[in-house]
Amino acid sequence: MKKFKLKGKAKGAASNLQDKTAIQKHREWRGPQDTAYDYLQWCRLWGILIKWAASHPVQNVKAVWRYRWMFSYLTVPSFFDRLCEGQRGAGLRGARNNLNYLASDVTKTLTTIFSADMHLHPGSKKAEERNKKIICVDELLPNLLGKGFPGCKMILFQEYPMYLPSLINQHSPVHYIEQSELYGLPADVCPLPSFEAGLAIEDDFPKIGCCMLTSNMPCDGSIMTTMLQERRIDLPSQVLNVPLRWKEDEVQDYAVGEITSAIEFLEKHTGQKFDWDALKEGCEIWNKQNECKFEKWDLNRTDIPPHTGSSAWLYRIFEHQAVAGEPLALKNDLKVNRILHKQVAEGKCPKTIRHRAVLWNTPCNNYANFNNWLLNCWGIESVCEMIDIHGEDLIDTSSRESMLRGLADHYQTSTMRAHTKGGSEVMLDSLWEKYEEYNADMIIMFDQISCKGVGAINGLFEEGAMKRGIPMVRVRQDLMDPTSITRREMRNDVNVFMQSVMNEEPVDPSLVEFDDDQSW
């Protein structure tokens, strides 16, 4: 691979990264205004974390010592810094507001979890009472249904011990994946269900809840690990099955029936009657949240795409799955949209954009800030990302029947589901549509080596790109397992493509090759 030299006295962004860990040596300089704003939001984050730690100090210390994955949350400030690397203007402001809202909500949920966790409070009557009002659901089932039980808290069961730690610290999944393989599970299965299985084997899921809704999403690996989790968790459970061919009208009655059955199951185990008025209120708030997202997509179609970077898709997933129908989430969305609209109206673009890329397939958890590197190193702006596009339909709240159908659609088009299931048109044809829609000039295709489903149509993507004359780079990754494909190998796939195929030089040569294998 070609070696690049920095011009003049320029040091490049990599000079601010510690060797091997890639932790920033000091705050990133972004100009006076942006640096000050970034610092104030960083202080705000620390305020959120300190407030959470001080609210239940003994309980939180117990959790850190009880659960291996809790150590990852101690590195959140560094994680947020990585997600904001190189950002300026509205992009920086939107990212920081989204991330700080996420931190605020996650810390509140962790307090709810740990207050009821029987591992931390064995024999506690208070914890037992709290568990009667906690509904556990599979992390790939959006919790909007829980709005119909306002007296209960619906918690994405694997979100906090598994999904978020895998983003924050690339090494957090490794121990649990190894445990699942030592237990005898296949080593070639997707790291996501392997991580979940390892948590169950290690008994590292919090012991909470009165019942649990499981799911057949997103793949057969997850279905198999659900059986293992159920044996370990020991809660009354029911599967909320989601149709595979969700584009077909014939399956919609079945999908509605699954929602209705889930409601009956939850009524039985919570002792509460389903509140349709509360559900309607939650759905209407979610519709407004979705409309805010539609605005962001429209803004990204302009010549000044303001809402990009890794924090954009991460926030969308969290909002769709964990805080749909939450008034505070809507308040944050409206604030961020005002910031984004202002920059586009002023015609300001505070970043170097050479290429507009569509990123397709599931992104890599253990390299969550990959989007930032693409822009900072090569000027590749991720104007559209597959994982960001789901749950696009508004829910009709005019009747109970229409809300049930809207919820069924909401579940069928959730994260890691909207494109990987439903037929080739939602995965293959949608790519070419988004490429035109966002005025892109290249495609970055994530090659998740452990995903058998998408791997089966890799050739169709390549044929389609060649037929249309679209530059497409395949970036290998293994979702949550950094021991299979490292971050450096992912970057190298892009580096080789940009040099040999696109015949370009990087925006920042210092970022072409650096060592971050020991990074969180």
In which residue ranges do the predicted regions lie?
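A charged, amphipathic alpha-helical module
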Residues: 2, 7-8, 12-134, 256, ...
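Gly/Ser/Thr-rich loops at beta-strand to alpha-helix junctions
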Residues: 135-144, 215-222, 360-367, 449-456
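Short, surface-exposed basic-aromatic patches at helix termini and helix-loop junctions that form
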Residues: 148-150, 226-234, 372-377, 459-471
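Redox- and metal-dependent alpha/beta enzyme cores, enriched for Fe-S-associated oxidoreductases
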Residues: 129-131, 139-178, 360-432, 436
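C-terminal regions of proteins
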Residues: 419, 462, 466, 472-518
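Proline-aspartate-enriched helix->loop->beta-strand connector
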Residues: 208, 435, 439-445
